[in-house]
Amino acid sequence: MSETSRIDGRRLDQLRDVRIERGWLSQAEGSVLVSFGRTTVLCNASVTEGVPRWRKGSGLGWVTAEYEMLPRATNERSGRESRKGKVGGRTHEISRLVGRSLRAVVDDKALGENTIILDCDVLQADGGTRTASITGAYVALIDAVNWLRGRGGLVSEPIIGSVQAISVGVVDGIPMLDLAYKEDSRADTDMNVVMSGNGDFVEIQGTAEGTPFNRNLLNELLDLAAGGCATLKQAQSEALGVTL
């Protein structure tokens, strides 16, 4: 595989086209439609006064997330989990990942006893749905915090940084950035990397689907991810009209 022989002709270190559109739903305190290529996720932030029972009286806020895919987001229809009566393991895992990633850049005390829930609904899936969800949900979170600030509902500034996420992997022995589904399904190594805007790692999820990877290859993948996250940070900044 050459540097120009990826499925869509991208370079090995090149993201798919990234689009971040704010204000997608008028009812939500924050609403963002984010696209990584053909992968499209609607991220809505909802603010409620109060916190879960186990957190009441602490003076701390709570940020959490729920992730789900529309039945026909993929090539074949998948049944609605609500009809099955339980949330699937993958859905639960990704919901927790999105929530953890956002909480990494939130000062719970400054948020006060308010809850912000991020709903990430995948409209179309072509690889990287969890990383697109994190990247888009952060922008929706910022809009929700700004809404709360405008209502006088904040103790102080709760956002202490930015967060981005991207996938990397090894396909046919070659490391590459931002895998589309057809690449991801053939990957020897698949990794999702969440980073803060200052370049620190929030979470790394990596698996050798085939051949194990060594430390040098891991470093190469992390370097690819760092470059991708820096580009995503710029896209978030442009969408918000501020410098993150």
UniProtKB/Swiss-Prot annotation:
Q: What is the designated name of this protein?
A: Ribonuclease PH
How does this chain assemble? Homohexameric ring arranged as a trimer of dimers.
Record has tRNA-binding as a keyword: yes
Give the similarity note: Belongs to the RNase PH family.
EC number(s) per UniProt? 2.7.7.56
- This chain's source organism reads Cutibacterium acnes (strain DSM 16379 / KPA171202)
Q: Which GO terms describe its molecular function?
A: 3'-5'-RNA exonuclease activity; tRNA binding; tRNA nucleotidyltransferase activity
The gene designation is rph
Gene3D superfamilies, alphabetized:
GHMP Kinase, N-terminal domain
